[in-house]
Amino acid sequence: MNRRGGQTAFAAIARNERAIAAFIPYSSHLTDTTLITHGADLVRTWRVQGIAFESAEPELVSQRHEQLNGLWRAISCEQVALWIHCIRRKTQAGLDARYENPFCRALDASYNARLNARQAMTNEFYLTLVYRPGHAALGKRAHHGQAEVRRQLLAHVRRMDEIGSLIETTLRSHGENHEQAITVLGCETDSAGRRYSRTLTLLEFLLTGHWQPVRVPAGPVDAYLGSSRILAGAEMMELRSPTCRRYAQFIDFKEYGTHTEPGMLNALLYEDYEYVITHSFSAVGKRQALAYLQRQRAQLANVQDAAYSQIDDLAHAEDALVNGDFVIGEYHFSMMILGADPRQLRRDVSSAMTRIQERGFLATPVTLALDAAFYAQLPANWAYRPRKAMLTSRNFAGLCSFHNFYGGKRDGNPWGPALSLLSTPSGQPFYFNFHHSGLDEDCRGQMMLGNTRIIGQSGSGKTVLLNFLLCQLQKFRSADADGLTTIFFDKDRGAEICIRALDGQYLRIRDGEPTGFNPLQLPCTDRNVMFLDSLLAMLARAHDSPLTSAQHATLATAVRTVLRMPASLRRMSTLLQNITQATSEQRELVRRLGRWCRDDGAGGTGMLWWVFDNPNDCLDFSRPGNYGIDGTAFLDNAETRTPISMYLLHRMNEAMDGRRFVYLMDEAWKWIDDPAFAEFAGDQQLTIRKKNGLGVFSTQMPSSLLGARVAASLVQQCATEIYLPNPRADRAEYLDGFKCTETEYQLIRSMAEDSHLFLVKQGRQAVVAQLDLSGMDDELAILSGNARNLRCFEQALALTRERDPNDWIAVFHRLRREASAGLR
């Protein structure tokens, strides 16, 4: 150091730094939700959820646009100004889950590693109302005592409350959940008694680029905010904190487009870098606004090559202004792009400028007054707003449309945490649940609707999605003392490998092969006796010829006789032996039932004995677990389909005892084509939620599902709908049958078949989500269940002779790789 008036080695750096307190206008918290500035302006901020624009109908988007314009008109006066921030920042996404099953643990770990390879992003909107009492009020403060000042402040706060109430009422329509559509930022106290301000937390982020809780200070706010050193260069700023350095560069509008429409800047919502977009708008008086339009029209009239249409447009704008269709105000825009590397930051700036210019705006990097653009992000910082322009409230509403993405619900669902975390094209995480519940409600333990419909053509990834969700469900086996039971009604064995990897039981019902079913070994309860009466009466029908009352009585007596025997003796053949043949009706009853008995009573074997005349009943859903039933063969056998279905569904009802329960139907149209399944599905759609259960239906044939006798229940009683890509989707099926909107239908058609994308719809909200398991070959082989994998699976079981997945999975993967390499 030079002791004679010299400069330190860091003097040059110090000259580039700013004492930021002078640039921060805030004095203190006046109330929990309101700040007051040194100039007596009042500041209040809300977080706005926004609308899921991807699938919103154009009419809805236009309606919301006009609502915003109407709101800005309603609150416009010289005392009111608005700051709106769109913040795109990195976020930590993930779900804490514990899986007992080794395959589920491995799948979840691989999947999360893939998700984490791409940084999750989130978009947040903040609306700040600035209320300026005006110079007259300031003058009064100077000439009156504290009591008068306090009275004036309370009056201003009440006026701000009135405006805020109108804002909240209007913006609650900008999200399906009305309570969380807009939430005011206030103060909260932690368990140690420390008070934190969410408003100051937002302002600190604008100053530092870091999101961290900020305590309510005892002293002035301006001296408390800003924990980073701010170094301003010619075109870039450095925000230096004790832990890292961040760089920032600004963009603003040099020229505006010829028109605006809602969502003009939506392309920026998909970018993979962090940024803060700031809009401010302060209305001017009608006289000043009209004078501005008249000057613009006069200037155009003096230009020889001016388009007459532009002059006419301004004339119409004058009329609209006078009629109150919009207001005009001073507007400013800035986009602060953040990054850790200056070179990457420049590339991100270039990308942002391209996106903006594609919409007709001329964007330019901010090089003059860079620090002014930085501090103008702070609400009520009037003096620093660069490149102000006059803009209508309708155009302002188009630039700030609060368009966002539906993010699902992470916590507080009926079964606790979200079922799964899915990626989206925007990078924003989507927390998927079968249940649909209010975003701001803690619904844990509530019995709510969770039925789900999955529609996807062959090859669209439907089987993989179903099996993946089945695996993700296994977290609830560990989380609940009552456990979880899933029953998968499968087709073409698509879920067999997966269910066996979960150490579940999988039953293939094939014509002529013993099923392992024996209904007569059910416990002798009133409910079971009634069921057996009904089932056996069906077996004894001949060509839809009903039993006589005498035959019903004979059959009922035999059933009750057999049920009093030890379980090992109860069989269909035993039942037949307990029917007397004193009358022709009784003999006819024996003849009909004989077809279902190993001993048909006439010295032969009944053709259908394999269905129910088995030594032991192997069907048991009483214990929590995963069960699969392949219906490929028996669903096409009209004679055995309904009796088998009746028994399966009766036993399944036993599992719906309050534990978490899910039944899944692949190619549901085929299952519900049977009357027993149709009746069950129709009834359970309405009542299963009361038993803490839900049903998941999938199909590649919408027409068959919509043509089912219970189609109305399957369509109307679904909380969640999933639509996989289908370029050949039939308009009538999707719009009239499934009640999709035109926008949703076009999304379903436009998604590439190999994109791994699908549309998830819950209530009025929808999102394009993605399940991309590329590179997870081992996991996909178990989830996909194709013919080649099934052959390798059967060979692996034969070689290991074990049901334990730990034994056969490794062999399965070896055989699969050998088959791919042409070694087998």
Curated annotation (Swiss-Prot):
<dbReference type="InterPro" id="IPR004346">
    <property type="entry name" value="CagE_TrbE_VirB"/>
</dbReference>
<dbReference type="GO" id="GO:0005886">
    <property type="term" value="C:plasma membrane"/>
</dbReference>
<protein>
    <recommendedName>
        <fullName>Type IV secretion system protein PtlC homolog</fullName>
    </recommendedName>
</protein>
<dbReference type="InterPro" id="IPR018145">
    <property type="entry name" value="CagE_TrbE_VirB_cntrl_dom"/>
</dbReference>
<dbReference type="InterPro" id="IPR051162">
    <property type="entry name" value="T4SS_component"/>
</dbReference>
<comment type="similarity">
    <text>Belongs to the TrbE/VirB4 family.</text>
</comment>
<keyword id="KW-1003">Cell membrane</keyword>
<feature type="binding site">
    <location>
        <begin position="456"/>
        <end position="463"/>
    </location>
    <ligand>
        <name>ATP</name>
    </ligand>
</feature>
<dbReference type="InterPro" id="IPR027417">
    <property type="entry name" value="P-loop_NTPase"/>
</dbReference>
<keyword id="KW-0472">Membrane</keyword>
<dbReference type="Pfam" id="PF03135">
    <property type="entry name" value="CagE_TrbE_VirB"/>
</dbReference>
<keyword id="KW-0067">ATP-binding</keyword>
<dbReference type="GO" id="GO:0005524">
    <property type="term" value="F:ATP binding"/>
</dbReference>
<keyword id="KW-0547">Nucleotide-binding</keyword>
